[in-house]
Swiss-Prot record:
This is Cytochrome b6. GO terms for cellular component: plasma membrane-derived thylakoid membrane. Heme b 2 binds at residues 93, 194. Heme b 1 binds at residues 107, 209. Its cofactor is heme b; heme c. The keyword Disulfide bond does not apply. The chain crosses the membrane at residues 39-59, 97-117, 123-143, 193-213. The gene is petB. The 4 large subunits of the cytochrome b6-f complex are cytochrome b6, subunit IV (17 kDa polypeptide, PetD), cytochrome f and the Rieske protein, while the 4 small subunits are PetG, PetL, PetM and PetN. The complex functions as a dimer. Heme 1 (or BH or b566) is high-potential and absorbs at about 566 nm, and heme 2 (or BL or b562) is low-potential and absorbs at about 562 nm. Heme c binds at residue 42.
């Protein structure tokens, strides 16, 4: 009843004449869903929902977080103890981060076990693997931002891993850290990656991933 009233309204007709909203809606709602699809095919969508929650709560926290080695921890404590519902926003961000990684792993397993990576969906699989790497990168960069003991030593260990690579190892370590040792330059780089670079990358590859799924449809059963 409500839908019919909206479609008969003058505003809806005005937009529909110019943007063909009804045709777009029909195309989305009429997409064929194979009968073998079950709840495990929702894991990718749940991962997307977790990312949206991450984006919203992360954006909210940027109003209070200070990417400084002297103020980062204090700003997080202020958010947790002084800001209204700040503890809830940060907690949701942490919980949904763990859930996003878990759902992503289960989604990868589901696609692999059902053969969703095979011809003609190789590119969809490749973009999915790239999205998985970006998701893990979000976790690595975000873990250090509170700049507490756990975050500091985590980033020191992670950024020191490439040092074992012959020839280019030390150069890569300095590139990641921004200097010879972990400090303000490291925190600034990780903050920039976490809040600007990685969100753009994941948005681009998500769009590519969804467009390919939309074009090729859901893979059939084994």
């Amino acid at each position: 009843m409500f839908t019919k009233q909206v479609q008969e309204s003058g505003v809806y007709k005005w937009f529909n004449d110019r943007l063909e909203i009804e045709a777009i809606s029909d195309d989305i709602s009429s997409k064929y869903v194979p009968p073998h699809v079950n709840i495990f095919y929702c894991l990718g969508g749940i991962t997307l929902v977790c990312f949206i929650i991450q984006f919203a709560t992360g954006f909210a926290m940027t109003f209070y977080y200070k990417p400084s080695v002297t103020e980062a921890f204090t700003s997080v404590q202020y958010l947790m103890n002084e800001v209204s519902f700040g503890w809830l926003i940060r907690s949701i961000h942490r919980w949904s981060a763990s859930m996003m990684v878990l759902m992503m792993i289960l989604h990868v397993f589901r696609v692999y076990l059902t053969g969703g990576f095979k011809n003609p969906r190789e590119l969809t699989w490749i973009t999915g693997v790239i999205l998985a790497v970006i998701t893990v990168s979000f976790g690595v960069t975000g873990y250090s931002l509170p700049w507490d003991q756990v975050g500091y030593w985590a980033v020191k260990i992670v950024s020191g891993v490439p040092e074992a690579i012959p020839l280019v190892g030390p150069l890569m370590v300095e590139l990641i850290r921004g200097s010879a040792s972990v400090g303000q330059a490291t925190l600034t780089r990780f903050y920039s990656l976490h809040t600007f670079v990685l969100p753009w990358f994941i948005a681009v590859f998500m769009l590519m991933h969804f467009l390919m799924i939309r074009k090729q449809g859901i893979s059939g059963p084994l």
